[in-house]
Swiss-Prot record:
Subcellular location: Secreted
Highest taxon in the source lineage: Eukaryota
Function: Hormone that controls sex pheromone production in larvae.
InterPro entries: Pyrokinin_CS
GO molecular function, one term: neuropeptide hormone activity
Organism lineage: Eukaryota, Metazoa, Ecdysozoa, Arthropoda, Hexapoda
Record-given protein name: Pheromonotropin
Source organism per UniProt: Mythimna separata
Example GO BP: neuropeptide signaling pathway
Keywords of the record: Amidation, Hormone, Neuropeptide, Secreted
Keyword Iron: no
Protein family per UniProt: Belongs to the pyrokinin family.
Modified residues (Leucine amide): 18
Length: 18
């Protein structure tokens, strides 16, 4: 499974970085 950071990195354009 992908970790939270991996998902955020993969969807960096969609998910804003906190």
């Amino acid at each position: 499974k992908l970790s939270y950071d991996d998902k955020v990195f993969e969807n960096v354009e969609f998910t804003p970085r906190l």
